[in-house]
Amino acid sequence: MAPDGSIARPTVLTGPSGVGKGTLVARLRERHPEIWLSVSATTRAPRSGEIDGIHYFFHSKERFNKLVQSGGLLEWAEFAGNCYGTPREPVSERVANGIPVLLEIELEGARQVRKSLPEAIQIFLAPPSVEELEKRIRGRGTEAEEAIQRRLKRAQEELEAQTEFDAVIVNDDLETALAELEKQMNLTIS
């Protein structure tokens, strides 16, 4: 059950690269360790230190394709020759047991989840402005100009889709965004 005794609803969180999804989710999980963050399945090889079932569910292409064909994934996509997706079963099990579930996924994945899990709360995390988003991306200092421009172009496309979501949270201040996310997820501070 959710904190108020209602049935737990899964929550989908998406937003452009650099908006602060990872930071917000980490802070949310500090305050609410009961939240289960979905674990993606992938066909890519594990990197050093990655543990199957913790960081990803590592599958062969054949096993992944069987999951796709059987409806075993809530959403999936292919990036750089590898497939990634959200397994349905672990999400369904936790929701059935009243555990709050959070899916931090890309826009296209969120659209697929809307069809496969219509009861999910869909939240879009937006930057205060495109200029601030660019500042954050450049502030990382990890990408070439061409990659930054690609991210900004994609971010503009994603920002145009925010009206598709149940709620939009502007990540101008981490604590304010956190309080709004907690409210949307019907979480209480213990």
From Swiss-Prot:
The UniProt entry, under Gene3D superfamilies, shows: Guanylate Kinase phosphate binding domain, P-loop containing nucleotide triphosphate hydrolases
Give a yes or no for keyword ATP-binding in this entry.
yes
Keywords linked to the UniProt accession: ATP-binding, Cytoplasm, Kinase, Nucleotide-binding, Transferase
Amino-acid positions noted as binding ATP in the UniProt annotation, renumbered to this chain? 15-22
Into which EC class is this enzyme placed? Answer: transferase
This protein's pathway: Purine metabolism
The EC number of this protein is 2.7.4.8
Q: Tell me its family.
A: Belongs to the guanylate kinase family.
InterPro entries (UniProt xref): GK/Ca_channel_bsu (IPR008145), Guanylate_kin-like_dom (IPR008144), Guanylate_kinase (IPR017665), Guanylate_kinase_CS (IPR020590), P-loop_NTPase (IPR027417)
Q: Cite the Guanylate kinase-like domain residue spans from the record.
A: 8-186
**Any idea what this protein is called?**
Guanylate kinase
Protein function: Essential for recycling GMP and indirectly, cGMP.
Single GO term (MF)? guanylate kinase activity
Give the catalytic activity. GMP + ATP = GDP + ADP; dZMP + ATP = dZDP + ADP
Record's GO cellular component terms:
cytosol
Cystine pairs: none
> Where can this protein be found?
Cytoplasm
Pfam families given for it? Guanylate_kin
Which PANTHER family does this one have? GUANYLATE KINASE, GUANYLATE KINASE-RELATED
